[in-house]
Amino acid sequence: MTPDEFLSALTEFDIQLSDKQIKQFERYFELLVEWNEKINLTAITEKNEVYLKHFYDSVAPILYGLITDQPVSILDIGAGAGFPSLPMKIIFPELEVTIIDSLNKRINFLSLLTEELGLENVTLLHGRAEDFGQDSNYRATFDFVTARAVARLSVLSEFTISFLKKNGNLLSLKAAQFEEELTDAKKAIAILGGKFIKEIAYELPNGDERHIAVIEKKKETPKKYPRKAGTPAKSPIK
């Protein structure tokens, strides 16, 4: 997907990018490749692949109507190089984005990236989601939590649901279908106060399958969750 094909694909969803936004994506690509030589951000560095598998894929929640141009708050867990939240932020600057990442080098990259791209209302937090999930400054404060290929749903639910306001949504983006994961995660989602709403299946323009699971927070997450860092991955709720 060339940059021009990226723009054309967005126009099919009635999204027209300004010259400023086009340049922001271009600079994003340049910085991603430049920093990837210093720290491991992505295995995908070829320009057309970045535009398809990082930029286009990241904005799927916008393309499929899950996130609109409202000043809602989004927490991105394990965003790595800023995916999916920062491409969405470029398209809808009104979004208030917070990113949690456990690796300080990635936070340094994201700090420079957001400054270079002129992105405002972006908060970067260095640490573990399990720790911030018990912090009253962040717990039950976000409209959306996004996570792209971070963990199985049973584990991801514990990482994320505590951060959501009531009626807020977890958007889990993955290549594979969620059917098997949902069966495993059903109990965890319920215990944590969530409810599976739907799965959106779609294809990238090259035919690759992608899926978004939408989980809505229906009630308060019990205070004991998330458990201490490392525990959810080692001992998922069953």
From Swiss-Prot:
Location(s) in or outside the cell: Cytoplasm
Function statement: Specifically methylates the N7 position of a guanine in 16S rRNA.
Keywords: Cytoplasm, Methyltransferase, rRNA processing, S-adenosyl-L-methionine, Transferase
Coiled-coil annotated residue ranges, if any: none
Annotated positions binding S-adenosyl-L-methionine: 78, 83, 129-130, 148
UniProt name for this protein: Ribosomal RNA small subunit methyltransferase G
Protein EC: 2.1.1.-
MF terms (GO), sorted A to Z: rRNA (guanine-N7-)-methyltransferase activity
Any matching Pfam family: GidB
Enzyme class, UniProt record, top EC level: transferase
Gene that specifies this protein: rsmG
Region (Disordered): 217-238
GO cellular component annotations of the record: cytosol
Similarity annotation: Belongs to the methyltransferase superfamily. RNA methyltransferase RsmG family.
